[in-house]
Amino acid sequence: MMMDEFMDLRPVKYTEHKTVIRKYTKKSSMERKTSVRDSARLVRVSMTDRDATDSSSDEEEFLFPRRRVKRLINEIRVEPSSSSTGDVSASPTKDRKRINVDSTVQKPSVSGQNQKKYRGVRQRPWGKWAAEIRDPEQRRRIWLGTFATAEEAAIVYDNAAIKLRGPDALTNFTVQPEPEPVQEQEQEPESNMSVSISESMDDSQHLSSPTSVLNYQTYVSEEPIDSLIKPVKQEFLEPEQEPISWHLGEGNTNTNDDSFPLDITFLDNYFNESLPDISIFDQPMSPIQPTENDFFNDLMLFDSNAEEYYSSEIKEIGSSFNDLDDSLISDLLLV
């Protein structure tokens, strides 16, 4: 009696252990029309152990050991096989777990699988695109960053590759060289000297006589020559000298006479008198015959040998006059 009361005062530890066993069966033609839940069967076997112990040494630890109670449950689930019903999963609990697991993992988008792969670009599990490049000098990878699209990451990789490896580096996109700015050449103003030289050359080709300098035109046109020649002002022209006319008469004056009022008029009659005709040239001259006692014979004027003498003298006189004329002309040119 005392022993039973003592056993009831001990602390009790209650645990439950459950074991599930699945069995699959093929459904008959009659049972295929029913649903999966109606065709599933459950067999449960339970047993309670009031004096259960984990090990043989549990009773020696304490003076008053605790009481251990175990409940053992065995379940046998009989379900139709998935091949006969065409269902993907037969267990509803297992389907719930699969749905929860699939929802946590993000599957890559279909568009991302078909995208082009770029050099130095890779996709992160959460969908971003990372770019990195290897530095050959430092022998390490350089992180370039993450981007929303693969194209942005590829462009950043291309720029870094050109900086590290030069313009001949392998890139994802063909980089077109920038066109060099064309410098506009400033037109230098033509010097006045060149213009004046060209004008002087043109003038030298079209020079005319001094009488036509005032009427010279520097341009050529299709108009007639008469229209191009403009009248010259009279102040630049020299006044024409009227010819001097002599009014010979007996002292009669006219209104158009240019003579002065104090001119002597008695000379008019003198100039009006006609000279007598000389008749000596009309008569033939008789030859002069020398005589013995003639004085001019001694002068050798009529000697035959005198011709050579006088011709030599005349030549010497002519040469002296020529020298005189040449010296006078040179002196005049120097002045």
From Swiss-Prot:
Report the protein name in the record: Ethylene-responsive transcription factor CRF4
Among Pfam families, the record links this protein to:
AP2
What broad class describes the main subcellular location of this protein?
cytoplasm
**What UniProt keywords apply to this chain's record, in alphabetical order?**
Activator, Cytokinin signaling pathway, Cytoplasm, DNA-binding, Ethylene signaling pathway, Nucleus, Transcription, Transcription regulation
Q: Where in the cell is it found?
A: Cytoplasm; Nucleus
- Gene Ontology molecular functions: DNA binding; DNA-binding transcription factor activity
Described by its record, this protein's role is as follows: Component of the cytokinin signaling pathway involved in cotyledons, leaves, and embryos development. Probably acts as a transcriptional activator. Binds to the GCC-box pathogenesis-related promoter element. May be involved in the regulation of gene expression by stress factors and by components of stress signal transduction pathways.
Q: Which InterPro entries does its entry note?
A: AP2/ERF_dom, AP2/ERF_dom_sf, AP2/ERF_ERF_subfamily, DNA-bd_dom_sf
The segment annotated Disordered runs over 78-121, 175-209
Where is the DNA-binding region?
117-174
Write out the GO cellular component annotations: cytoplasm; nucleus
Family, per entry = Belongs to the AP2/ERF transcription factor family. ERF subfamily.
Q: Where is the composition biased (Polar residues)?
A: 80-92, 101-115
What organism does this protein naturally occur in?
Answer: Arabidopsis thaliana (Mouse-ear cress)
Read off the SUPFAM superfamilies from this record: DNA-binding domain
Which GO terms fall under biological process for this protein?
cytokinin-activated signaling pathway; ethylene-activated signaling pathway; leaf development
